[in-house]
């Protein structure tokens, strides 16, 4: 019982001030985790084999309990080794697992409806997982096994980022927004955490009335789960036709006057294209740095989930507007009105 106890203690980061247990976003890389997971899987197979060999009720229930316990431990050790940036893929993959389990149950019970529904859930989850892994230039086993780096990572020393960043205030940003004609907003998980979608939606509505072309660029793995940002923007009343996927909008950045990055980091990291030794090399990102002017709205200069410095922060056409996203967007909205 010592191993599961150690896993649970390491997995949860207790914060008394928040008065609840919060999951630690950093991956839990246990020593020998691959060997441990392999042993747990073999134990599951062994329990299943014994279940078929011994038809007695006692043996069957014992093996069922054993398989349940081993599967629970393996579920924790597998999922905990995956970083926060890969959680959207984990969610869709677990969704796919549940579908195939339902499909197998349908076969066992000779229930066609369960089989069909399970196949639909399993295939849709698998397709979503594939789409997001392709967007990150990674394979599904690479994500599920808690590995780092894309298939294009050269393996050398990452480039060092030199220079200083430029900071602007709300008044400077309002002036840039007023002077811009074409504006693209790229939200990330920080927008959802701060609940800034409502002032952003109202600001976009005002800018559209003033004749400005404002659109949103959404990365496939942006947010805490698939489609989270699309849902948040729709909830706030943003029209569907101005919310575009990465492939639809990436070629338009070079013709954009102003780019507003709100709470995004890894999904707009230019190191994916500029540094072949970066662990995110080859990952498909939103090319926001091609815009004439970039304003990055973040709480701080800290790195994202991938723990990779973002060269965009130090580019000559980029400036940082630091602070809480909702408070900043509220201030921008009040000055634009």
Predicted regions, residues:
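Conformational gate/switch positions in structured elements
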Residues: 85-87, 138, 319
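Membrane-interfacial segments at transmembrane helix termini in multi-pass membrane proteins
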Residues: 120-180
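Mobile "lid/hinge" segments at catalytic clefts and subdomain interfaces of large enzymes
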Residues: 83, 97-141
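Acidic, glycine-enriched active-site microenvironments
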Residues: 1-89, 93-96, 114, 119, ...
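Proline/glycine-anchored alpha-helix kink/cap motifs
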Residues: 88, 104-106, 177
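Gly-rich Lys/Arg/Thr-decorated short loops/hinges at beta-loop-alpha junctions or inter-strand turns
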Residues: 19-22, 26-27, 45, 147-161, ...
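Structured cytosolic domains appended to multi-pass membrane proteins
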Residues: 159-325, 331-337
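Flexible glycine/proline-rich, aromatic-decorated loop/lid segments
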Residues: 90-91, 95-101, 235, 311
